Structure formats: structure tokens, C-alpha cells
Amino acid sequence: MITIEQLLDILKKDHNFREVLDADGYHYHYQGFSFERLSYDSRQVDGKTLFFAKGATFKADYLKEAITNGLQLYISEVDYELGIPVVLVTDIKKAMSLIAMAFYGNPQEKLKLLAFTGTKGKTTAAYFAYHMLKESYKPAMFSTMNTTLDGKTFFKSQLTTPESLDLFAMMAECVTNGMTHLIMEVSSQAYLVDRVYGLTFDVGVFLNISPDHIGPIEHPTFEDYFYHKRLLMENSRAVVINSGMDHFSFLADQVADQEHVFYGPLSDNQITTSQAFSFEAKGQLAGHYDIQLIGHFNQENAMAAGLACLRLGASLADIQKGIAKTRVPGRMEVLTMTNHAKVFVDYAHNGDSLEKLLSVVEEHQTGKLMLILGAPGNKGESRRADFGRVIHQHPNLTVILTADDPNFEDPEDISKEIASHIARPVEIISDREQAIQKAMSLCQGAKDAVIIAGKGADAYQIVKGQQVAYAGDLAIAKHYL
């Protein structure tokens, strides 16, 4: 429960309070209300709900519906003049985060918090950390792929970083379940829209940066994207940073006065020997590590997670066992066809991660390589040119472009846009299952491979704003082995 007095005190301390408006006019103080629930969904309110009117598409009709369900007061940046009191604020998203934090009893203070950011590798690194910490502790995890609040039950995540009301409700459930640590992926979008406003992490990890999520509804420029990524460093007590990433010198200067550790080529924490399924490291993680996920970049993700978990109480033995046990749904999953050709299913969904994926496969498969690829509609438009650039640099690839969450766009138009950046003919088959079947039918022997990129373990396609059932890349590939 939270009272109106407590609510106003939080807003005033954050300099986010304007006034309370009701039929009697303006009020600096207010009383007589307490709330047992928080909501930003007008369909889920009653007389004891504190409702947040948020979003560029919010309509007064939503508020009218909530009032008919018993709503007595709301928080907003706008007075909709509907006859009930409104708490007016300058920034509704910041208000949501701080009020949710207090409402749920500050659960962040009862968990050790580890956050990963980066253009690629967040989910893989989070899974490594989860398995490392699980050896001696009780970690919960919020990742793009899956969420677990009790270490036993996993459910599909809707957002990389949940909305603040959901985030703190889930954190509180983690505390109730006896969890000791929480591992999170923190997206640039989470900082752009203040989902984690006011939250301080025990350790923040910056894996890498490359242009992505740049478009009309995301970040307008790379500078804006990079800036919002860096906010995790400002909001972490200690940081772990990849010294091999672009703009590392800037980040090194930024974190000079806080606890930090670097890994990679310009640090003492390096991979000294790399094999397909093992690596040797020097520095704080000195030793031998077995790993199921192929690729040097996955070994670097394991290093990042290991250094972070070392700060959170994990032993070197915990880290070794955790790395050896880690598998990630939809990340570098490998199938073998009856003719011994390989099928790689991976979530690679931007130019940088696609380049890494192709390079790893080319190390191991020297025959005909087939790539199945698409790009999402109505977001991350810059990826399309990036995909074309990467494909152009791999001339031996046979490419089939297909649908990947086309949303409100025509998947064929998206494919044609990608194709416009490739200086050789490519095939377009918009039906993703047909594209996979066609590619697999062209493989003839053990040196050949099909690379299915983009959707990973997702068992749906986003079409016209809705999740439409889709068997999933892995299930389809298994069917045609």
C-alpha cells in the first residue's frame, strides 16, 4: 500500500511534482487516498488503484473507461479534465519507477543486482552469469529470452527490460521467493524511457557497441544510442568493460573514478588460447574453461560474466562449472542433417552479430553455405543496410531473404530493401518455413551448412502488431533433417 502523502513526498524529492488538481483548484498537499495496486492499463483498475496515464498514444477514452471501473485519482503529465483528482508531473516515466520502487518495498535493496548492456551478447552473458551464480546462490534472471523469478519456472519475456511497474513487482516476487541475486539485461531503450530510473546496480557490464536500434521510434542517431547505453555505467557501483570495444578510451575515462575491471586485448584479463569448445584465460580468471557455445565472442561473453560474478561472490570453481553448463535457447544451436550437413540456428539480428555468426560458421564449414535472413518491420531500419554490407563481404554465401517479424510492413518490401545493398543476386521467399526447407534441400554433405539467423527460439511472427503462431526455426529445421 502507498498513501497519497507518501506518493507526493517521492515526487517532490525528485523535483517531479507540479500540483494536484481537483474541482477545488490547485493543491500542494493532499490527503484522503491510499492505494493497494498500481497500473498503467486502464482495463485493470478499481477504486484502490493508482493509475498512470502514460504513452504518446494515450487517449482520454482510456481514462473514462477506468473511471467507470471505479478509478478515483490518476497521475499524468496532462489534465484530462474528467472530474476526478489528477496528480500532475513533469515526467510520468520517472514517477512510475520511483513510486513502484517504494510501493513494492524497495526490493532492489534486498538483491545483488547485475546488469548487462551491449549491442550483442547480453542474453548469452546473462545465461553464463545465471549458471555461475546458481552454483552457490539463488539467482533470478530477466533476459530477452526468458525470465525466472524462482530459479525453477521460466517464462517468455515481453521486453528486454520490463516496464518499471512490472520490473519492481517482479523484483518483489524474487525477494519473496528467497532469491539472492538478480541478473538483468538493460537495453538502451530502458534508459531512453526511464524504465530503470533511480535504480543502482551492484555491477554493470558493457559488452560492446555498434550501430543498432537507430530509427524513427528508437534512437535518432548512434550518438544517442551510445549515450543511453553508457547510462548503465553511471548507475552501477562497479563496472566491467570490454577493452576491445569501439570507443573504449572514452568509457575508460568515464569510469576512472569508480570501481572497474577491464577484459580483452588492452587488459590483464585475456583469453590466451581459444579452441572450439574450450579456452584458457589469464588475469583474475586464470585457468582452463570448457564451453558449449562455439565462437571467440561467446568466450569473451563468458569472461565478462565471470569477472562480474567474481565481484558478487562466485568462486573460480563456480565460474568454471557455470561456463561448462551454459546453453542458450536460440543461440548457436547446431543440428546435423541425415547427409551430415550442419544447420545453425541463431538469434543474430543486427549487422555485427551476423558478421560474428558467419565468421564462426566459416571456420568450421568449408562447403556450400546457405543463409536465411530477414529484418523486422517498423523498427531498426538501419539493420537492413548493415545486413547487406555484411552479406556483400561474404561472397560465397547463397542467400535467401525471408520474413522476420514484418509487423505492418510487407516482408517482400523489407527483403528488397536488404537486397538493394547486396551487389549480387539473392532469392526472396517470404514464407519463412519454405525458405528454410529450400535452403536445407540444397545441402549435400558434411562440409555444407544452413545458417538460420534472426529469430532464434521465437515461436511467433509479429504481423500487424500481433504475435502470430510460428513453429520456430529450430522446430522447422528438425522437421526437414
From Swiss-Prot:
SUPFAM superfamilies attached to this UniProt entry: MurD-like peptide ligases, catalytic domain, MurD-like peptide ligases, peptide-binding domain, MurE/MurF N-terminal domain
Motif segment (L-lysine recognition motif): 404-407
Gene3D superfamilies, A to Z: Mur ligase, C-terminal domain, Mur-like, catalytic domain, MurE/MurF, N-terminal domain
Claim: Transferase is one of the keywords in the record: no
GO CC aspect terms: cytoplasm
Matches recorded under InterPro entries: Mur-like_cat_sf, Mur_ligase_C, Mur_ligase_C_dom_sf, Mur_ligase_cen, MurE/MurF_N, UDP-N-AcMur-Glu-dNH2Pim_ligase
GO molecular function: ATP binding; magnesium ion binding; UDP-N-acetylmuramoyl-L-alanyl-D-glutamate-L-lysine ligase activity
Thermal response of activity: Optimum temperature is 28 degrees Celsius.
Compartment list: Cytoplasm
EC number: 6.3.2.7
Biological process annotations from GO: cell division; cell wall organization; peptidoglycan biosynthetic process; regulation of cell shape
Pfam families registered for this protein in UniProt: Mur_ligase_C (PF02875), Mur_ligase_M (PF08245)
Binding residues annotated for ATP, in chain numbering: G118, T119, K120, G121, K122, T123, T124
Keyword ATP-binding listed: yes
Family stated for the protein in its record: Belongs to the MurCDEF family. MurE subfamily.
PANTHER family registered for this protein in UniProt: MUR LIGASE FAMILY MEMBER, UDP-N-ACETYLMURAMOYL-L-ALANYL-D-GLUTAMATE--2,6-DIAMINOPIMELATE LIGASE MURE HOMOLOG, CHLOROPLASTIC
HAMAP family: MurE
Main function: Catalyzes the addition of L-lysine to the nucleotide precursor UDP-N-acetylmuramoyl-L-alanyl-D-glutamate (UMAG) in the biosynthesis of bacterial cell-wall peptidoglycan.
UniProt name for this protein: UDP-N-acetylmuramoyl-L-alanyl-D-glutamate--L-lysine ligase
Lineage of source species: Bacteria, Bacillati, Bacillota, Bacilli, Lactobacillales
Gene that encodes the chain: murE
